[in-house]
Amino acid sequence: MTISPSIMTTYGRIDIAFTHGEGSFLVAEDGKKYLDYASGIAVNAFGHCHPKLVEALQDQASKLWHTSNLYRILEQETVAEKLVANSCADRVFFCNSGAEATEGAVKVARRYAWANGGKERTEIICATGAFHGRTLAMLAANDRPLFREGFGPSAQGFTHVEWGDIESLKQVIGKHVAAILVEPVQGEGGARKAPEGYLKLLNDIAKENGSLLISDEVQIGMGRSGTLFAYQKEDIEPDIIALAKGLGGGFPVGAVMAKAEVGDAICLLYTSPRPRDS
């Protein structure tokens, strides 16, 4: 059976379709059972169809699906409070994917710089081997030119330094830098763990320069490193954290987490309960 031509060929899909799954196993159309090593590419943190996840989704789906951000969302507040209680962050913004989380993190960093008199601080420093998503801006944050090929001019304001090399960072850091964006463990770059002490040095240099540190935990976060967040393995507190994948266990959700003063720089930017002419 061939893949439907109605689907854009954006991915090199294997011609296997699964009908259901349980725990670590998937079952294909022909009944063949597979041990799932991919886990939805670091998404299915609790396996397939975990009873508690199924129960939570079915319960909520039977009560209310969507209201918009015009109103309080109690369940959203509950999750945000749990994330804050178990991290160095104070504020949480929810989105739908990892790319939205990383791009949102960059927006928050630049907005914070702008709100604090640093309008010239727009540059984001990234590392070689980095992968931060596939939105137009994040294509520029990624290191590999292949990802950017054919998509026109790259978004401005991204500089790459050698992964693990502090000296290359020191050569480009300056008052034009809004933030350093880093994966504690690179995924697309080959499952590379940051060298011992590297994150601590990044954090120190960012602080000395008045820049922010963004920890991209989209793939490595939510317990995959042995701690809830990978940054917790070193004595640092990033200013912003990008989160997704395992956060929803298969349900599409991402989050931008930030320190209070950083997150508050973007408050009421898009909508307000007040009338427009008030």
Feature locations, PLM:
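Catalytic PLP-binding core of fold-type I/II PLP enzymes
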Residues: 192-226
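Short acidic, glycine-rich surface-loop motifs adjacent to enzyme active sites
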Residues: 177-190
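Conserved small/polar residues in nucleotide/adenosyl-binding loops
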Residues: 270-277
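Active-site-adjacent loop/helix segments that line or gate small-molecule/cofactor pockets in enzymes
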Residues: 1-22, 70
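PLP-dependent aspartate aminotransferase-fold enzymes
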Residues: 80-179
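Active-site PLP attachment segment
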Residues: 136, 227, 235-266
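Glycine-rich loop-to-alpha-helix module at the N-terminal edge of alpha/beta enzyme cores
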Residues: 5, 33-119, 123
